[in-house]
A protein has these predicted regions:
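Acidic active-site catalytic centers that drive phospho-/nucleotidyl reactions
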Residues: 36, 95, 201-204
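Short, flexible hinge/linker loops that cap or flank conserved catalytic cores
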Residues: 24-27, 41, 86, 199
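Acidic two-metal-ion nuclease catalytic site recognized across multiple nuclease folds
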Residues: 6, 12, 17, 60, ...
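ATPase catalytic-site recognition across NTP-hydrolyzing enzymes
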Residues: 1-35, 49
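Residue-level signal for short segments within beta-strands and strand-turn junctions
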Residues: 49-51, 209
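Mg2+-dependent endonuclease catalytic cores in nucleic-acid-processing enzymes, primarily RNase H-like
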Residues: 51-183, 228-233
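Short acidic, Gly/Ser-rich segments with clustered Asp/Glu that frequently serve as metal-coordination loops
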Residues: 34-43
């Protein structure tokens, strides 16, 4: 299906091809949205939905209109509740680095106004340190750590990917090396974009949708507004 890989790519192509969705998605017990916000006008903003570890690409919007992205998230949350009769918490995991912060802020405003109930907003800042002490001994940065979560899920057949050629190409193209301290280090988004000619926006949205492995399925008593203590292990 795809050309032969280099030896230093992080996601084995055979593993990705074996993880493609071919069946209908059943009713979900757990649902997350991964939101990768475009950094530049030529990039895509992508929303990936993860229901019971079955992942779909729900919205791909070219460019960086932040308020349209907020609207897309609100509509997707509404659709999940209506289409799947979903009554549990929806976790919206956003790349909060740079422009993504504007999406996070507006969604939290809507929550404070009572217009986005049953939703927890989880910002992920990719310039921050790896949040897990044990993982920080193995992974150079939070990008490498986040991608490792998806890779581990795919290896254990705990996640199913959509049949999307561009997504698989992005996932199978990202390279890695070892830092001087022996930690796994994925190439930067900028370096990958320069090398392959596009930003791995679909891949990053899928990675974000799987970051919920580090989220407790609870909310703060008496409130559906998530805090750091309510969603991080």
């Amino acid at each position: 299906m795809f050309p032969k890989q280099d030896d230093d790519v992080y996601m084995p192509l055979e593993m990705l091809e074996a993880s493609i969705i071919l069946e209908e998605i059943p009713p979900a017990d757990i649902c997350t949205l991964g939101v990768d916000v475009a950094r530049f006008a030529e990039d895509d903003t992508v929303i990936a939905r993860n229901m019971n570890k079955k992942i779909t690409l729900e919205k791909i919007r070219h460019g960086q209109d932040l308020m349209k992205t907020v609207g897309d998230v609100v509509v997707e949350c509404r659709n999940i509740k209506e289409k799947f009769k979903y009554k549990k918490t929806i976790y919206v995991i956003i790349d909060d680095t740079g422009l993504g912060g504007g999406v996070t802020d507006r969604l939290n405003e809507l929550k404070s106004e009572g217009k986005l109930s049953g939703v927890v907003i989880v910002p992920v800042n990719f310039s921050a340190a790896v949040p897990d002490k044990k993982a920080a001994e193995k992974y150079h940065d939070i990008t490498s750590y986040a991608w490792s979560i998806l890779r581990d899920m795919l290896e254990e057949k705990e996640a199913v990917l959509p049949n999307d050629t561009e997504l698989i190409a992005q996932l199978s193209a990202r390279k890695y090396d070892l830092s001087s301290s022996g930690k796994i280090r994925l190439e930067s988004k900028k370096a990958m974009k320069e090398r392959i000619g596009e930003s791995p926006d679909r891949a990053d949205a899928v990675v974000l949708s799987c970051y919920r492995n580090k989220i407790k399925p609870i909310s703060v008593p008496g409130s559906d507004v998530g805090t750091k203590d309510s969603y991080w292990r």
